[in-house]
Each structure stands twice: as C-alpha cells, then as structure tokens.
C-alpha cells in the first residue's frame, strides 16, 4: 500500500531522498519533465486535455520532523537536537532510527525514581542509546550531523476507515497528489511539486513557487481535527466527517 510505504519511510527535513525515490517510482509513468531542483524538490508536469490551459501547481511536502546527531558521549550515547517542531514531553522512551544505516536506538532519560522534581526533561538532557559502550564505537556507527527519525509503523485500525502511523503530515498529501497524477490527465496543466524542508520554514515550497510560476497553486496539507478528544470542543467547526 502506497501510504504505508510513504509513512514508514524516513525523510527528516534536509534528507528526503528515501521519500523522493518512492514518489518518483509511483509517478514516472504518468508525467513528463521530472526534475529534482537544487534544494531537493521533485517536480513534474502533466499535460492537460486541451490547449492554452491554466497551469495549476499541486504541492505536498515530503519531509517530516525529527532530529540531528550533534555529538557522542564518552559512554557511547548520542547527543541530538530537534529538526522542526518537536515536543520534549513525548520523547523519553521513544524508539528511533539513526543515520543512513537506520541504526535502532531509544531516547533515554534519568529514571523516574531519580527525577524527583517531575519536570519535563529538556532535550539537551536526553540522549539516544544505540547500544554502543564507548565514544569510538558510537562514532563508528553514526556520524555527527546524521538525521534521526521516529521508528514507527503503519497499520489500519480494525473495523474503521482510520489508520495510525507517523508522518501523515504530509505523506497523506503526497499520497493524494500521486493518486491525482495516476488518474489524469485533466482540463488543466498540472505542475506537481513534492517539496522539501517544510517543517523548518517552507523552504522547498518557496523555491518551487518562484521557479515554476504557476497560474495558481493548491497545497495538500494535513492539520488537526476536532473529533479527538472532544467532538464538542468547537461545535461551529465540525471537521469530524470531513477533510480539513
């Protein structure tokens, strides 16, 4: 399933290559003029039905939030910093994959019985344990500057139309855009832009829009809905049954 493959791929902002390859394989037979620009966006063109058609850019970003390795401790643990908006509260105990080799690791913190003040542990005080016992061993497995992604899997929730997984922001958008291209052409010329580095400042989309200069653009993006945890939280904005 395409969404499963997209969701489980790791593409932290600045290194979206794994996601880009999945997208390329899915659209290459349905478009022309596939390009990867200098920042890493994958763009493609699909000629519409007719002449002198409007040029519509459909955009979805390939990247996800994550981390970067910033150093190695003497005991083999990794120091790291966030890429994109990561909430410190969710980190302790999370499984991650580190670097090009996708070395498995766990984000660790001071055991709860030693953390008497019960405050949220800041990211600077957390470490990633990759099973190394020395700085040299850790450096042999993972280099400074390598990306760290969440180790999660995709699954359908039984008996529902729902699914769980990571990076639905914005792999769902990528999946929808791929589906659009696979079912074209349409009475417009489509410029598909699978963009990079959205989570760190909309960088790829800015480059794509300036370079491609479409007549109009539609961005396929995810956001929160009000069905969880309280469907009555905002009764004037019922997004429960609909895309937002």
What are these regions (language model features)?
Residues 1-244:
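N-terminal hydrophobic/helix-forming segments and targeting peptides
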